[in-house]
Amino acid sequence: MKLLFKILMAACLLANVSVYADEIASSALASIIEKQMDVKPQRIIKTPYLGGLYEVYAGGELFYTDEKGSAYLVGGSLIDGKTMRNVTADQMKALQKQILANLPLQDAIKRVNGNGGGGKRTVITFEDPNCGYCKKLTRELVNLKNATVYTFMVPMLSEDSLVKSRRIWCAPDRLQAWDDWMVHGRAPTGSENCANPLERNSKLAQKLGVNGTPALYFQSGERVPGYMPLDKIEKLLK
């Protein structure tokens, strides 16, 4: 893996690689990847690197292979040897930004603090109601000035997480029910028998590569897994 990484660094040439979600440059390669790697590619593009290296986006991650799927570079970064630009990081940020611009925000709990940031200070979170660090994050987000926060509930931890998520979503005031539990420790007790987006949220989380909570996303395409204090959130919003 280290040798392949060094070869990539030495051989890559400067190029601008466009990012298009759900683009499959080779259906044959997609079938090979799905069989060998047990993941369904959401996007495959042919790059100008190394005589035809393919970039694959699946499960919220990028990796690389050739047209036959004979070898894979997973968990590393593709570095442009001329400019030393991290192609993988740039591509991931651009792709995440595109995906975030088309999120089904109606499936999230919406919080508007102050003037909401005028559309320029938006945070997307994925949270489980029984996640301790999610509760800590919520207490920070309550105090985030002039911003809009969209929270997608993804009950990952237990059956009780699913029950709480349903009750919060079915509450007359979802944000109030969420804060009552996450900030004040007052568990939701109302009905859980209403249509909810929880299954869709889980599929969305999988598509974005969210495998733990909390997870934060910013309009820039920046992705932060785990808890963040308020001051660091502010820095990413500037």
Mark where each language-model region is:
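Hydrophobic h-region of N-terminal signal peptides that target proteins for export
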Residues: 10-19
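Short, exposed beta-strand-loop hairpins at the edges of beta-sheets
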Residues: 219, 225-226
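Conserved NTP-binding/hydrolysis module of P-loop NTPases
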Residues: 168-170
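Sec-dependent signal peptide recognition
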Residues: 2-10
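Short strand-coil-strand connectors
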Residues: 59, 219-220
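Extracytoplasmic thiol/disulfide redox context detector
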Residues: 5-6, 19-166, 180-183, 190-213, ...
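Conserved, helical-rich catalytic subdomain that frames metal- and/or nucleotide-binding sites
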Residues: 172-179
